[in-house]
Amino acid sequence: MPSIFDYKHFFDDYCKERSLDLHLSFDMPSDYETACGTFDPASKTVFINAAHLNAKPDYEKAFFLFHELRHASQYLCPEHFGSEIHRSLQYVIGYDGTCYKLVNGHYISCKLDGNEDYFTNLYLGQPHEVDANTFAYEQVKQLYGCLLYTSPS
């Protein structure tokens, strides 16, 4: 049976430490039902797909929570991040080639041709994604340490 990961505890600690007023929801928005998480800057809501992550180990649950919390900080506290991250937040590249650009507070979209591997690499290379992944990894490493690195016997 999977352990019960306390999303709310880590969420509340993160928000308190950074004076962020955010919401946490486990009801994924439309079109994000298969995602592990997302952040919506308009509603200041971190969405975590707890049902999808239920069977995953706690360190994976923590990773996705901290990843989305980092996105919240990127959007709401841009002064703490460099111009490269701030600029990259205007663009979203989906795994399927759907791309978005933030223009006057609204996203415009287009669909590019290509395979999923290509778009996955583009997605993972976006500066705000690299930063969120690095931050989440460091947080998980602090929480779980060597549990992540058991060498095969």
Predicted regions, residues:
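Active-site metal-coordination segments of metallo-dependent hydrolases
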Residues: 118-134
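Post-HEXXH active-site segment of zinc metalloproteases
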Residues: 77-118
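Active-site recognition of the HExxH zinc-binding catalytic motif
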Residues: 63-75
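Short arginine-rich
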Residues: 138-147
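Catalytic zinc-binding patch centered on the HExxH motif and its immediate surroundings
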Residues: 26-47
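Zn2+-dependent metallopeptidase catalytic core
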Residues: 2-19
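Short pre-active-site segment immediately N-terminal to the catalytic Zn-binding motif
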Residues: 48-64
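Conserved small/polar residues in nucleotide/adenosyl-binding loops
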Residues: 149-153
